[in-house]
A protein has these predicted regions:
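Rossmann-fold NAD(P)-binding glycine/threonine-rich loop
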Residues: 111-127, 135-156, 160-163
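Generic secondary-structure signature for well-ordered alpha-helical cores
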Residues: 39-43, 55, 62, 66, ...
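General beta-strand structural signal in soluble alpha/beta enzymes
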Residues: 91-93, 108-109, 133-134, 157-160, ...
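Core active-site phosphate/anionic-ligand binding loop and the adjoining beta-turn-alpha structural block
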Residues: 144, 151-220
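Short, ordered loop/turn segments at secondary-structure junctions
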Residues: 27, 51-52, 96, 112-113, ...
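Glycine-enriched alpha-helix->loop->beta-strand junction motifs that scaffold or abut catalytic
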Residues: 103, 127-130
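Predominant activation on well-ordered alpha-helical scaffold segments within soluble catalytic domains
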Residues: 35-36, 58, 122, 144-148, ...
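N-terminal glycine-/serine-/threonine-rich beta1-alpha1-beta2 phosphate-ribose binding loop
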Residues: 1-123
Length: 220
């Protein structure tokens, strides 16, 4: 699907059924980027954010331009639904509540934790919701299994457009459309190569980039 077509279909969907309501798990660097970008997109809205650090979720929504009065704490699924019905953004510390909330159409996992992401994805599927995996750590480990579980549940399991795997596939598709034979595909390294990097040495840089130090070091 082309980007212009996608934009048009989002508008059509919003006119007929209202915007797609997103539940976001995680408000770190990637999660915050999602909140900010969705605020600019017609046809989508962030309905709820689950984050073990609630202030991080609040800060992400404020950065996206939402008023503080439009951000409410929601301890359980019914509270999340009430917030969404009232046009608010719900902030919860409970991933289970996010998975169970009835007013959410699709979940984005931006936790970056493979164990949490896997268990959460399975719970999301059991609740009949589609899941976008912005958790490459989980996807690369057990994504094939999760894809099959989604098929059994009748929901969609997919990667995130804009993340590196999806961008690589877009480039492959473009090259094939030009008649090229693809023999290899991947990405170049855009971080320093440091074999001895440990999280404790990068706490300050990670905080400045709104990242987990362990994850930052993983890229080195």
């Amino acid at each position: 699907m082309s980007h212009p077509q996608f934009a048009a279909e989002l508008l059509q969907r919003a006119e007929k059924q209202g915007p797609i309501t997103i539940g976001l798990a995680g408000a770190g660097q990637m999660g915050t980027d999602i909140v900010v970008q969705v605020a600019l997109m017609p046809g989508m809205r962030i309905g709820a954010i689950s984050e073990v650090r609630p202030q991080a979720a609040i800060d992400a929504a404020l950065l996206a331009g939402h008023d503080r009065s439009d951000i409410v704490q929601a301890p359980n699924a019914p509270a999340i639904d009430r917030a969404i019905e009232g046009g608010k953004i719900a902030v919860t510390e409970d991933l289970h509540a996010l998975a169970a909330a009835g007013r959410i159409d699709v979940i984005i996992d931006a936790t970056g934790n493979p164990n949490v992401g896997t268990l959460f994805a399975l719970e999301v599927m059991k609740n009949g919701k589609h899941i976008v995996m912005l958790n490459v750590e989980a996807d690369i480990t057990i994504g094939r299994f999760l894809k099959e579980e989604a098929r059994k549940a009748g929901v969609v399991y997919t990667g995130a457009a804009g993340d590196e795997p999806a961008c690589t596939l877009e480039i492959i598709g473009f090259a094939r459309s030009l008649g090229f034979n693809i023999v290899a595909a991947g990405k170049g390294k855009n971080n320093p190569l440091k074999f001895d990097a440990v999280p404790a040495d990068y706490e300050k840089e990670a905080a400045e980039r709104n990242m987990n130090a362990r994850m930052l070091v993983d890229f080195f």
